[in-house]
Every structure is written in C-alpha cells, then in structure tokens.
C-alpha cells in the first residue's frame, strides 16, 4: 500500500488491486485449431481456412479485452480520485493481459504472431501452461498468474467472436464484489453447450480446476464447477452467457452475432469483431439462411 494525502489533509492508504485477464489459446496453425470446423472431423472447411478464421477471432478477442480493460482502468482512476477527495479508502485497479499457450515452443510463436501484427493497445504477456490434462494445464496457468501478483483472475478462451467489452467488465466487476468476501468465491459465464466460456476467482479463494474437465461422474463443465463450488462452500456469481465456436452449428449462430455486433458498433460503445467479420465475408459465410420448416407448435387456432 502507498499513502496519499486527501483534500482534508489526512493521509489515506491506497491499495492497488491487480487484475489479470488470462486468455488460453493455441497458435492458429492448420490442423491444430478448430478442427471440428474442418473436413478432418465433422466440418466443411479446409484446415487452412478454419485456422485463418480462428486467427481473426483471436485478434478480435484480444482487442476487445484490451478496450474493456482500458475502460475499467479509467473508471477505477475516477473512483480513486473521488474516494481520495472524500477521505475514503482508495482502491486503484490495474489490469494485465496474459496469453497462455502450449507447449513451451509456442510461446515464441505466439509472441511473434502478435508482434508481426503491429502495436497493441497494451503490453501482452505470454506464458506456457503444461500438464497431462485440461485440468492440469488450467491449474498451472492460474498458478503462474498468481505468482505474477494477481489478486483476481478472469479466464477465457479466444474462440468467442461475440465477446463484448460489457462481458469483460461484468466479469471483473463480479470479481470485485467477491474481493472482500472471507474465503473468496468464483464467477462464471456459461457457453451454449453446458460448458463455461468465462471462469475466475480471487486470490483468497482456495479453488482450482481439478476434476472439472472430463468429469468422472459424467458432469459437463458448467455443472462440474457449480458442484465443486457447492461442495467447498464457495459463493458463485453468474455472468451473462457467451457463446463460443467449436462446431458448425456454433459457427452459424456466431455468424449472426458478428454481423449484429459490427452493425450495432455504429451506434453503441461496442468494439466490433471486425477481423472475423471480414474473414467470414471473404469465405462467403457472412450470412445465414435457413429453409422454412413446420417444426413448430400448432397454430391453427392462432393464425386466422
């Protein structure tokens, strides 16, 4: 803590709260990412096309996160000034953007990928996560982020082109609600397939990812986190759902969201996923049309 002089002349303590956004991502290498969108599995695209699309999603998500963190830092500075003027405790939030990848050789691959793209709004930190399972990879990435001094971690994947600044802000604001709670707690946002798209907790929370992925009792990821929190007695704060892209059906849904976000950005404070939108347009997949169907409830007594 540092000391600041308030307008009333007294010395007030300033606490710096360090927040980390931990983004998990592999390099956009053909055959390594988004394979369910490709002919290698149950998709329709060549691996080079799917990896190129993911490349755009990754950059869009990082840009959106950076924009959200800039907003959060500005708001924190304004609150700190108001608290100082009122002679109240000052909490100043700092944010760090961390990208975790695997294996270790891909750290430099990712660093070069972003460096070659030009200047980014803030420093990007690159880490390597290792382990024999998703659980172990995620646990190690969290451990490395705590070791960097983080007080709160909000983690997510990069295959979410419909992510908004509001989603990121909501995640950190929820974490801050838990900051003073004895024992801590978790925050999570569901995806569209019984999993989570965002998960995080505070430093004080004795929690990890063990047993969540490929749960031995058959639970999917969202109920596995809830079950784990319930058994350990931790509060959990629910964030708005954020869809990701794994399958062709996921992609269809996200195509409509990307189009809407890019249009709405003209009229609202939205950082649009413009790279993803451009890639979809170049692929000829920038709009979705569906054939009519009669799989609906009876309407004979309604439509007359």
Give names to the regions the model predicted.
Residues 9-39:
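N-terminal nucleotide-binding beta1-loop-alpha1 segment
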Residues 163-193:
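Conserved donor-nucleotide/metal-binding helix-loop-beta segment in metal-dependent transferases, i.e.
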Residues 150-159:
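Short beta-strand-to-loop acidic/aromatic patch adjacent to the donor-nucleotide binding site
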Residues 29-37, 107-110, 197-198:
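Short acidic/His/Gly/Ser-rich catalytic and metal-binding motifs that mark active-site loops
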Residues 206-226:
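Short, glycine-/small-residue-rich phosphate/pyrophosphate-handling segment
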Residues 53-75, 85-90:
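A short, N-terminal amphipathic alpha-helix
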Residues 80, 105-141:
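Active-site-proximal specificity loops/subdomain of glycosyltransferases
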Residues 220-304:
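Conserved alpha/beta core of the MobA/IspD/sugar-nucleotide pyrophosphorylase nucleotidyltransferase superfamily
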